[in-house]
């Protein structure tokens, strides 16, 4: 069900969200992009990598970044991740628009990848073995957290983690 109306009564533009969406580009057979000749060398050099031996899918990632910016979605960066064919982008938003922008950024990612004949996999652990999975980290702050902060505020956040994590 749509909880937008209820959320709009609580969430304000003073609430800032930063999402870090990790994903793999995939070949039509489901294997990660760049793994066409089998399993690549161990992960490590791929993180924020450059060079054809270290990245696969950069053009798609950059096209996605540009499309989101043109659509008014505030992507603040993109980078190659720990495994070959794995990428991340960072999406910043305020209030309810943050969630909308995350969903639309994913939609644009899938559509642009389709134009290149590849898929997108956001599964948390798409490859078995000693390969990193993909997450979607969520960062949050409000005015108090960005300005004054306090030990009391920090402690209350830690207490909430016992219920929510």
Enumerate the language-model features and the residues they cover.
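Glycine-rich, acidic/polar active-site loops that bind/position phosphate-bearing ligands
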Residues: 1-162
